[in-house]
Amino acid sequence: MTVTNVAFNPWTWEFTLEGLTVAGKNNNPPLLSLDRFYVNASAQTLVELAPVIDEVTVDGLNAVVALDDEDMRRLMNGHGSAEGGSSEKASSESSSLPSFAVYNISVKNSSLQVLDRARAIDQSVTDFNLELPFVSTLANSKSSLVTPKLSMKLNGTPIFATGSTQPFGTTLSARLNMKISNLDLAPVFKLVPALNTPSLMLENGRLSTEVNVVFRNATSGKPGKMLVSGTVNVNDLTAVQQISNRVQPLASFKKASLQLTELDLLEHQASVGSIVIQDPKVHFVNTPSGLNVSQTAQGFSSGAAADSGKDSGSNSGWHWRVDSVQIRNGNATWNDSTVRPAAKINVTALNATVTGLTNAANAKPAKAEAGAKVFGGMLSLAADVTPAPLVVNATLKASGLQAAQLASYIRNATGFDASGAVSLNVKAAVKGSAVTGSGTASLTNLQVKQGKSTLVSARTASVKLGSLDTAKQSVNVDSILLDTAVVNAVMTSAGLNLMPSKAGAAKKAAQKDADAKTTEKAGKPWQWKVASADVKNSRFNFRDTSVKPNAAITVSDINASVKNLSSAEGAAATVKMSAGTAGGTLAADGTVTLSPMTADVSTTLSGINMKSLSSVMTAYAGIGAQSGTLESKGRFGLASEKDKQVASWAGDISMAKFNMLNAKGRSLMTWNNAALTGLAVKTTDPVTLCVKKAEIDQPGTRETKAIRELSGLASLLTGKDKYAKKTEKYLGGSIVLNGVRYENGRFSAEGIDGNAVATALLTKLSGAMSTKLQ
């Protein structure tokens, strides 16, 4: 380092430094050269107990900063670590600028070059000239005749600023107007490490500004001002990132503009007229290694965390207001390779406006509106927002959202394909951590498929949410409607087709465990109520190919309703249902409770064609029917017995023209009419079944022939012809059985020792049904 001249006048407090040179390494150009540095300090410094400088002149300052130089990196890193603690402490002690005053500032013929060969950085500021009348935070009436101006070239692009001044007394102020036109930002971006990482690289951008800076001296009891206002425009900004060794787009916009009404650096107040972003595009990419924007955010958050201690003190006192924020014609894409097939979702025509956003206390809420095309439909949002403390009241509306747009996620979770149109009209309020909501949701033209087979379809499924309150942990649903639904259930040896795939079931089980743990930690369970749930004009088709013969049944014209279903202890809900099956009708009416689980429901079957139910009867009871008509009335019950849920049914059954078949399809027994009075069944272990009275009118010829053969054989063996005659008198009339029971795999009845026909009937029933009822 060399210096040509150093001079200091103690009487006038003038300091002059001339010919300063700091040589570069290995015969490189000087790192720093300074032709002349002049400072004229004022005696007012002693009065104000703060620096007061009458004049500062810097002439011919030329610096070269080599970012890839080891000494420079050591200096920069050491500076950050050594002074970080003290600067943090200083910033926490005061959130305002220190007291000082500098007048008649002049910087001439200066330049700065920044180099980093490893990152191909070669940026320069040349022909730098700056003149300012003053920069002051002190109440001082000193005059200045300097007219503010600025000129320089940034990488060859001229930047000019001109100004005016009111130099005397209480009106001491200066204004500087700076204009930048179409400055290429790409070279400037290279100077910022956070903008040159694999997760974020800014490639293009053009900057245009017109900014006014006002310096107003603190005089006549009025505080000093440092005010900034103007407009900033950035055009054609493009950001990319590296994913799987490929450079892919991250974000871009056609134009972003900022209209700064006033920024008061001393009073920590900011007023923004408008922020407008035109044609923004954002590309979200989710891979097994993570979400691309999360990786980008981590780069910023690490730097922000390091500076948070320094900045928290200075930022805490800021008051701000933004009159308007707009996004026009935005687009976003979502690509997710974590599911198969890969998901791709597009958001287009995104337009959003926020007005009156501020952190001022007791301010009116900001108004927000947004709309976009997504999932093949339209989505809109209107909200009132108060930032601090956070309060949001919003209305979300959607129409024509296509479930098929989420096909990859639905298939990945369940193994099914789904389609349908979703509409929403939801109101929500957020106050701190509490959320309340209400609204409606509907799904039309629903279809759930597995391959080419349709599992579920519905014309309409809708929900009306009365209220949701996370603070109270309560949900009240006004109504649920399922209209014109068709369910096609098929049981195979692999399981029920309506169940999710193994992968989906595993995820569902894992989620259920996680939810259970969350509920356990939360302590208090959620309370919910459904005022009304209805199923209209629906059908249920069932086939079971896992049994021989295959079983099939169809329940059509299903109309059902549930009222006041609730999680409350002992709350009873009313249920009502009617449907058609096997050529007849069935109906149910009664009450159920969920806590504890109970049911008391009357049931009615009328005109049921037994032949239509033959496959189901054979598969699950071991007997079928060639013909017959079933009528039934009774009550279904569900209750807890010895800590086990037990289902029961009690009532009367009658059958006409009944021809019973065994599992092989052969006629087992026939009769014209049969009535079971006082039938009671319970799903205990083993199953309990009893009939108070069974009447069978006119047994068929197959039974009478079998009994004649049995009685004839008995008479030959015993030599008692009276036994055969006694048996014969039962064959032409009716059979009455009292106290029929099913125990230990066999049917029995009271007082049938002399009734061979009755004994034969029960024997055949036992043989045919025992394996199914065990």
State where each predicted segment sits.
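Elongated, acidic membrane-bridging lipid-handling scaffolds
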Residues: R36, E83-L195, P223, A304-Q405, ...
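Structural detector for hydrophobic anchor residues on beta-strands
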Residues: I159-A161, L207, V228, G437, ...
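Flexible beta-edge/linker motif
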Residues: N5-D71, S91-Q113, S144-V146, L172, ...
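N-terminal amphipathic/hydrophobic interface segments
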Residues: M1-K25, Q166, T170, K179, ...
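Surface-exposed loop/turn segments flanking beta-strands in extracellular/periplasmic regions
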Residues: M76-G85, S294-A304, M499-A510, L717-K722
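Hydrophobic residues in beta-strands and at strand termini
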Residues: A41, L132, I180, F215, ...
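Flexible, surface-exposed loop regions and adjacent strand-edge segments
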Residues: E70-G78, A194, Q248-P249, S289-A297, ...
